[in-house]
């Protein structure tokens, strides 16, 4: 990944030079592209790229590559349109800007974003050296990210890339952090410019997605880049064409050391060609990029190598663009930092623009690189490792601008992947209308193709940057065709993979803001856009994520092919697609209703026509229940109530036994008679045996009669065993002699002598007699 990222670094430097860095900064990658106007768009795209940042830098990369070709204004305009749809619509109606036109020249980026204006001014001052610095300082447009990364990367020798990386790193890109040391100086510059471009950062803040959601920023940045590319045909088309995450662009930049992605901030469309020729001249930055590469190898991001060439071209074509795009370039560098982690994504994003577009969009990973050259280079590096540089130089120059233009239309797809993307898409579409005459369809196609190519390239890049690179490489053969094809893919399902989102963004940017927005929002829903925008968008998230894994830089070479700005067509077609044929209202007359449902079909409710018919029941013939017919004619009425009281004649009633005697009894206290009859029980009742004797007994203390029968059996009793003991008992003598007395009559054997106790014998007889009486 270190090598691929280094390659991407080259591309990312390129992206930075072209303004991809600005986008990247915005989206962690893409934000730098249109720091001023694209900051908002970049923010949106940045979110897209930030996710890429983690593992998919393709959105940023795509944007970077797309941006590589387009000028800073193109990049700025798209970002502005995307980031601030309202602003874009009002301030930047998205007039198509010449590919070579810089953001300041076009006035697109400056109008939308104060940050861009500041960046543009700064960039104008230092056209060559400051282009890079401003690229990075513009990253301060997303200063939070750029500064963070810069601080994190004190050793960042590559200021342009450093800011980009820093911008991206705030997005949360590991690679960015790695490159932080390398980009620390850049980050410092970025901070300085950040103060200048704080307005830009606020735009990004408005984009919100850009820095806060690093990952979202990557995607959003990508979307913004694509949208920016759409707004400014070259810049926007390139990002859209890249359709890959900023890392893809970063990888492309890395893969193409000669092509500092960062250097290329907003390079003109022909900047790629210049870069090709100027790459040697850019070598000063190249060494810087080389060091960046080393750091990228260390950080897995190489931004310096490609930065100078792009910067030179950017300076040549749009020094203001470099100022603005340099800021984007810083984001592009951020994308390059991401490039390592998202490098493959960037490559993949570049793959979508195999044609010259892709080379231009190759730095798309680097939001700043707006020259497709970067993409092409990245593609070459991914595929060939070196050939990519030349291709990128070629296709990046013209195709990149075209690609960026086309990409803007494709950008809408990027928005689709993320919520921020959709917002960006609307903005992007607003910009897209600007290059409607441009190959908007191509843009949409390129993003699609790029998306698939980017994915393949990324896979290859991940595997060897050869498999996926080859897909893009295949696309490169027909760089223009592929650029168009890539843009067409925006319409077609293939595009959705990764570049599609970028392409969609570009395409949508191309279309009028309202149209593009609807396209972005609708692409996923409408079948037509689903191919162009929806497929790209839905595919784009996945594609981007895939792109990070798949190095698509080789395929990006095709991006070099200047993609005709058909993206506007794509957005238009997307719109037409989105517009579903009006569905005629169902003919209810011919519809068979459910059972009984048509009976009231003609019913017209009317409150006054209600007739209540009361039918009186003829009860004369009705046989009522027993007695119920008597009252049938009874009419309740308070005045005619008659209560018939019939007293009950009890004279004829035979009462129960004894009850008739009291029938005339009237309760009253005066006529109470109490009759007491004493019953003589003795006369009528026969008592039980022996019980009658006491029937007349009245309880009383004086009349007690106690009959006592003395039992003497104890006295006469003898123990069965003679144990020699004496039996002592109380004699039941009436006299009351209760003192125990010695039984003298007890034999020695202990047996009682009954003869000596006549009382006991008598008692026994009485008891037996009494028991006999009772029947016992």
Swiss-Prot record:
The modification N6-methyllysine is found at residue 594. The modification N6-acetyllysine is found at residues 480, 560, 594, 616, 625, 633, 646, 652, 656, 666, 678, 682, 704, 720. InterPro entries: MAP2/MAP4/Tau, MAP_tubulin-bd_rpt, Tau. GO terms for molecular function: microtubule binding. Keywords: Acetylation, Cell membrane, Cell projection, Cytoplasm, Cytoskeleton, Isopeptide bond, Membrane, Methylation, Microtubule, Phosphoprotein, Repeat, Ubl conjugation. Its main location: cytoplasm. The modification Phosphotyrosine is found at residues 18, 29, 532, 729. PANTHER family: MICROTUBULE-ASSOCIATED PROTEIN (PTHR11501), MICROTUBULE-ASSOCIATED PROTEIN TAU (PTHR11501:SF14). Promotes microtubule assembly and stability, and might be involved in the establishment and maintenance of neuronal polarity. The C-terminus binds axonal microtubules while the N-terminus binds neural plasma membrane components, suggesting that tau functions as a linker protein between both. Axonal polarity is predetermined by tau localization (in the neuronal cell) in the domain of the cell body defined by the centrosome. The short isoforms allow plasticity of the cytoskeleton whereas the longer isoforms may preferentially play a role in its stabilization. The tau/MAP repeat binds to tubulin. This is Microtubule-associated protein tau. The lineage of its organism: Eukaryota, Metazoa, Chordata, Craniata, Vertebrata. The gene is MAPT.
């Amino acid at each position: 990944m270190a090598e691929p990222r280094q390659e991407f670094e080259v591309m990312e430097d390129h992206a930075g030079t072209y303004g991809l860095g600005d986008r990247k900064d915005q989206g962690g990658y893409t934000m730098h592209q249109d720091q001023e106007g694209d900051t908002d768009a970049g923010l949106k795209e940045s979110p897209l790229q930030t996710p890429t940042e983690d593992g998919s830098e393709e959105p940023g990369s795509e944007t970077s590559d797309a941006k590589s070709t387009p000028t800073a204004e193109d990049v700025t305009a798209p970002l502005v349109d995307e980031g601030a749809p309202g602003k874009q619509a009002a301030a930047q109606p998205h007039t198509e800007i010449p590919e070579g036109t810089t953001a300041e020249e076009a006035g697109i980026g400056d109008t939308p974003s104060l940050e861009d204006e500041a960046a543009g001014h700064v960039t104008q001052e230092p056209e060559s050296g400051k282009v890079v610095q401003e690229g990075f300082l513009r990253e301060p447009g997303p200063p939070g990210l750029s500064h963070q990364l810069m601080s994190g990367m004190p050793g960042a020798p590559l200021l342009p890339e450093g800011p980009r990386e820093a911008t991206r790193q705030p997005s949360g890109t590991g690679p960015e952090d790695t490159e932080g040391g390398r980009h620390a100086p850049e980050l410092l510059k970025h901070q300085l410019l950040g103060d200048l471009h704080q307005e830009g950062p606020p735009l990004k803040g408005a984009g919100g997605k850009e820095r806060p959601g690093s990952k979202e920023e990557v995607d959003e940045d990508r979307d913004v880049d694509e949208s920016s590319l759409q707004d400014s045909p070259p810049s926007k088309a390139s990002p859209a064409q890249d359709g890959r995450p900023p890392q893809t662009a970063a990888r492309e930049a890395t893969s193409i050391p000669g092509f500092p992605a960062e250097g290329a901030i907003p390079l003109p469309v022909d900047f790629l060609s210049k870069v090709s020729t100027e790459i040697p001249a850019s070598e000063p930055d190249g060494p810087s990029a080389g060091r960046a590469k080393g750091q990228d190898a260390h950080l897995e991001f190489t931004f310096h190598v490609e930065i100078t060439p792009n910067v030179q071209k950017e300076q040549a074509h749009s020094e203001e663009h470099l100022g603005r795009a340099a800021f984007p370039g810083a984001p592009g560098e951020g994308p390059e930092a991401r490039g390592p982690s998202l490098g493959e994504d960037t490559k993949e994003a570049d793959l979508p623009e195999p044609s010259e577009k892709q080379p231009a969009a190759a730095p798309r990973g680097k939001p700043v690189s707006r020259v497709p050259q970067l993409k092409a280079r990245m593609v070459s590096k991914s595929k060939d490792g070196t050939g990519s540089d030349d291709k990128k130089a070629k296709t990046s120059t013209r195709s990149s601008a075209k690609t960026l233009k086309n990409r803007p239309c494709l950008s809408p797809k990027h928005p689709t992947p993320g919520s921020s993307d959709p917002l960006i898409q609307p903005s992007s579409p607003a910009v897209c209308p600007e290059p409607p005459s441009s190959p908007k369809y191509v843009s949409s196609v390129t993003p699609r193709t790029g998306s698939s190519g980017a994915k393949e390239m990324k896979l290859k890049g991940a595997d060897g940057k050869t498999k996926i690179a080859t897909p893009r490489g295949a696309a490169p053969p027909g760089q223009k065709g592929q650029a168009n094809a890539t843009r067409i893919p925006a319409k077609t399902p293939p595009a959705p993979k990764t570049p599609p989102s970028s392409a969609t963004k570009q395409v949508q940017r191309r279309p009028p803001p309202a149209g593009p927005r609807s396209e972005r929002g609708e692409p996923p829903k409408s079948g037509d856009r689903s191919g162009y925008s929806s497929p790209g968008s839905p595919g784009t998230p996945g594609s981007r994520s895939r792109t990070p894994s798949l190095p698509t830089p080789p395929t990006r070479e095709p991006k070099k092919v200047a993609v005709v700005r058909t993206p506007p067509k794509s957005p238009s077609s997307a719109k037409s697609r989105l517009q579903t044929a009006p569905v005629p209202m169902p003919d209810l007359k011919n519809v068979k209703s459910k059972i009984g449902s048509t009976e009231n079909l003609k019913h017209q409710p009317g409150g006054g026509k209600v007739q209540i018919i009361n039918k009186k029941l003829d009860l004369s013939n009705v046989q009522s229940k027993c007695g119920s017919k008597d009252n049938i004619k009874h009419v309740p009425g308070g005045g005619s109530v008659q209560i018939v009281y019939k007293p009950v004649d009890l004279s004829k009633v035979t009462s129960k036994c004894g009850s008739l005697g009291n029938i005339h009894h009237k309760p009253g206290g005066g006529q109470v008679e109490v009759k007491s009859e004493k019953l003589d029980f003795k006369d009528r009742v026969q008592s039980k045996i022996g019980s009658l004797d006491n029937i007349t007994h009245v309880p009383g203390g004086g009349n007690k009669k106690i009959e006592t029968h003395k039992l003497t059996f104890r006295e006469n009793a003898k123990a069965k065993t003679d144990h020699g003991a004496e039996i002592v008992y109380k004699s039941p003598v009436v006299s009351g002699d209760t003192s125990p007395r010695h039984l003298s009559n007890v034999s020695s054997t202990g047996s009682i002598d009954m003869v000596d106790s006549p009382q006991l014998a008598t008692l026994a007889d009485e008891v037996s007699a009494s028991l006999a009486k009772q029947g016992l």
